[in-house]
Amino acid sequence: MTEFINRLQKVASNPNAFKKTGRGIERETLRFTPGASLSTKPHPEGVGSALTHKYITTDFAESLLEFITPVSNDVDTVLKQLEDVHHYTVSHMGDEKLWPLSMPCFVTHDDDITLAQYGESNVGKLKTTYREGLKRRYGSVMQVISGVHFNFSFSTEFWDELFGEQSEDQRKESVSDAYFALIRNYYRFGWLIPYFFGASPALCSSFIQGRETSMDFESLGKTYYLPYATSLRLSDLGYTNDAQSNLKISLNSVNEYVDGLNKAIRTPSEEFAKIGLKEGDKHIQLNSNVLQIENELYAPIRPKRVAKSGERPSEALERDGVEYIEVRSLDVNPYSPIGVNEDQVRFLDMFLTWTVLSDSAPMNDSEMACWKDNWNKIIEKGRKPGLELKIGCQGERLTQKAWAERVFEDLLIIAKEMDRVNGDDAYQQTHKRLSAMIDDPELTISGRLLAETKAAGGIGVIGCKLAVEHRETHLAHQYRFYTKQELDTEVERSVQAQKEIEANDKLSFSEYLEEYFSYLK
């Protein structure tokens, strides 16, 4: 019996080990006008304060909405919550629509994009200044790429069965070590996510206007594409940061990770120092270090813990270890009105369970570089028949199909255990549908989207068509989890909460920044 099977049988002996898995979803999407341009309107007043609303906020830009679900133990519940907040928001957007693709179209210049605004409080100004810094460092167009983030945690019962009796400190350390083992395996095998769910094989020419690229694009009118690409969002064209490439933050333990993060937020950048900190009285970045704050660290997956008020993410991890992980490699699913579907959630349930129960040796920088090379191959040509990937750095190779089939043998065992606990066959059905995509790459989201893009004459045409369809779906939606009254109440609460924060400020913004960044001294 393999160690993986042994561990799986241990946790599966307790039905609540799987039933109490925690999941939350964050979905980003741009508002755009009937004339197919980026919205220049403020955040819709009818959905409350972007600073304080629990479920509806903004990301980089005022037009870049972000929908957030609370943590749920039920797959159906988390999707219902997402549907409800989409319906509520679209109902307050007039004739504007939500862009259904990860890569923006019709955006040609940084000046087209208004930074997200959070009011007059110091914390609100901090959020906007941070975004001003991102704009000056990397440009705004790159920052309005949309994605879906999946937050995931194993249950207390899962850890109880896996580790047995432990003291509180032992448990904290074991759980953190297990999550970092998962993260290392995610880098080794997570290329399966863009293979199945990558949804950006093509982009509007406006996105790369004036940008250098070594990619050998084919063109279709104003659309550029790579014939076998899966997720250009995850490529060098998407959200990457050259300044961060030298950070090499260790993923071997929570202490090493926190040390690396602390170093990064304290490392000065000559390049960013040239930007300056102020223009007149206006703050244009929070500081000139490699990372202004820890959230600037780009990663396809992050270890997380809910932070206390005033606590940095790394301080929360240092205090009590890893609580959950945030998967950040999902493109927006253009075929789902909410940007993600049940098969994706169920696949991640199975895959993340497999990554934590499988062996996961420590990883050095050179091994990480080899695994990242596999990701880049899948991102740029993942559907190419016979594409070979490295097995570590040893020179051995395996086709993406053969490797996916091997992983899926283990995932089927997990699917059967999860279905046994739940009394249905939902995970096995997901496994079956995705297995078909291993056999035929054109069934993947990127394969389907590229075929439809070619038939329609461009990616912008597809985006506009799907946006209209999804808007109709959202407007016709009936509440399935929340009530309208509950969401109305949250709007009122958020507006009041922002007013209270603004009224309670005692420091000037400059004083506030000095106090906020006192840890850098």
From Swiss-Prot:
Pfam families: Glu_cys_ligase (PF04262)
GO molecular function, one term: metal ion binding
GO biological process: glutathione biosynthetic process
GO CC, alphabetical: cytosol
Keywords: ATP-binding, Glutathione biosynthesis, Ligase, Nucleotide-binding
Top-level EC class as recorded in UniProt: ligase
This enzyme's EC code(s): 6.3.2.2
Pathway: Sulfur metabolism; glutathione biosynthesis; glutathione from L-cysteine and L-glutamate: step 1/2
Catalyses which reaction(s): L-cysteine + L-glutamate + ATP = gamma-L-glutamyl-L-cysteine + ADP + phosphate + H(+)
InterPro entries found in the cross-reference section: Gln_synth/guanido_kin_cat_dom (IPR014746), Glu_cys_ligase (IPR007370), Glut_cys_ligase (IPR006334)
Family from the record: Belongs to the glutamate--cysteine ligase type 1 family. Type 1 subfamily.
Protein name: Glutamate--cysteine ligase
Species assigned in the record: Aliivibrio fischeri (strain MJ11) (Vibrio fischeri)
